[in-house]
Amino acid sequence: MTTRLARGLGIGASAIAAGATVAAVGATALSRLSRPSGEPGVLTNVNGLPLHALIHRGDGPTVVFENGLACACTEWSWVLRDIADRYSYLAADRPGCGWSGDDGRRRSAREINELTAQLLTQHDLPAPYVLIGHSIGGLLAMSFAAAGSHDIAGLVLVDSSHPDQLVRSSAQRDAMPMAEHAMGSLFWRTLSGRKPSRVAVSDLDDLPEHEAARGHRLMERPAPWRAAVREIRTFDAWCEELRTATLPRSLPIAVVTAGKTDVGDSKHGELQADLAAASDVSRHVVLAEADHDNIVMRADHAAEVGAAIDWTVSHSTAQARKARSA
């Protein structure tokens, strides 16, 4: 995560600081917290919670996507278009984001992974799985891979969070309370019926036109901002889960880093390189013109993410052949 969003939001005076409560906003505002209709994918009941996902059945392994903070699965639109002729995929919305329902629960990384695993099972999407995570979603992808309960072909980390980033980076540490405050401000702003500031959602404009319009409508609702606050407050616990986890050294890992994130945090590149160093079979690409959000939402950057998926699949196949011949 970066400070770019927090800087651009004008977070000085929020409804939270004024002591607002949901009850004080009224019934009309509460209705804005309901799950939106018009979902582009399928809804699946998982333990009583409606979860939305984009699902495609194709050849090759199944690519499993984990979205960035507050983002819907449609943030991957360009990537999904790119890989649809080669792979199956599951791109799901976490509780409270996109078109998924929300029960207000804080979940551990393991519990989020269990929701994903149930979606894979219910929709009969076969292993092996290539896990791909953007931003905070990278923590969840790494956690899923480290659990060792599924056949994992590889891991793709796109400007991913690092489990030690708040320890090793003062910029990330300082940004965390600003990010929480910013997301809280956006929650109250949208709950009261006001649109988010343009700068907060401007990267959505890089998506295909129809998805950009749909994304803007989603982010005018308070639910994703509430979910973002919850996930920020759970971030430390997710990191702690990963500190005690181990990834196989033979697992192919592709890391795709946004070069512009380095501008605000001199430690970012070091942390990204550290993610790649977790495997003996790794690839690290830095996209100089990409920022933290458009690295998946802009078509040219998304093509590089698709290439990272291809690299991971090819090296997973090579690793499997090597293991069989040993």
Residue ranges and their predicted role:
Residues 210-286:
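Conserved serine/cysteine hydrolase catalytic core
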Residues 91-130:
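Active-site loop/oxyanion-hole signature of alpha/beta-hydrolase fold enzymes
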Residues 127-169:
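Conserved hydrolase catalytic core segment
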Residues 280-326:
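Catalytic active-site module of serine/aspartate enzymes centered on a nucleophile-bearing elbow/loop
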Residues 64-68, 134, 159, 258:
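The conserved beta1-alpha1 loop
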Residues 93-98, 161, 290-291:
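Short beta-to-alpha linker loops that shape the active-site pocket of alpha/beta-hydrolase fold enzymes
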Residues 2-30:
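Hydrophobic alpha-helical topogenic segments used for membrane insertion/localization
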Residues 49, 55-99:
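Conserved HGGG/HGGXW glycine-rich cap/lid loop of the alpha/beta-hydrolase fold
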